[in-house]
Amino acid sequence: HQQDFVRRVGQDCIRYDIPFLLELLVYPLPNEAPDVVERHKSKFVLDSVREFAKPEYAVDLFKLESPVTDSELGDPDAKQASPVQQVFMEMGNLAGCPWVMLSAGTTAANFRRILKI
């Protein structure tokens, strides 16, 4: 259902020669515990980008939430930032087009840390 809708919007954007900006947000399904997204956030965000980056959706620009939780951030200048950086690099590679980062309700300090990574 959502994929068909996004596909139709992408085709309309092509038809009317307007850019398609798609904002992806992950939420738990109705039968899932609320913490399921937090535990698997990287996988869910990356899977969403992987799907909607396919040419059939015709997305020109993504608005994406961080693929990592605040608790995974650590110090962006420390060695442990490297695995987090890898997740961001994978997200960028999967997107295949420009993307901007959403704050996703995090604090200003944590958003700055995300941007530093």
Predicted regions and their residues:
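Catalytic-face loop-and-helix region of soluble metabolic enzyme cores
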Residues: L61, E65-I117
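Active-site beta->alpha loop and helix N-cap motifs at the rims of alpha/beta catalytic domains
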Residues: H1-L21, L29-P30
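Active-site glycine- and acidic-residue-rich loops that bind
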Residues: Q2-D4, A33-L46, E72, L102-R112
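Charged helix-capping and loop-helix junction motifs
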Residues: Q2-V6, V45, Q80-V87
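Structural recognition of alpha->loop->beta junctions
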Residues: V37-L64, I117
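Generic structural signal for hydrophobic
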Residues: V6-V9, C13, F52, M91, ...
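Active-site-proximal loop/short-helix segments
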Residues: F20-H40, L64-E72
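Short, well-ordered coil/turn segments that N-cap beta-strands
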Residues: I14-F20, Y57-D60, A95-W99
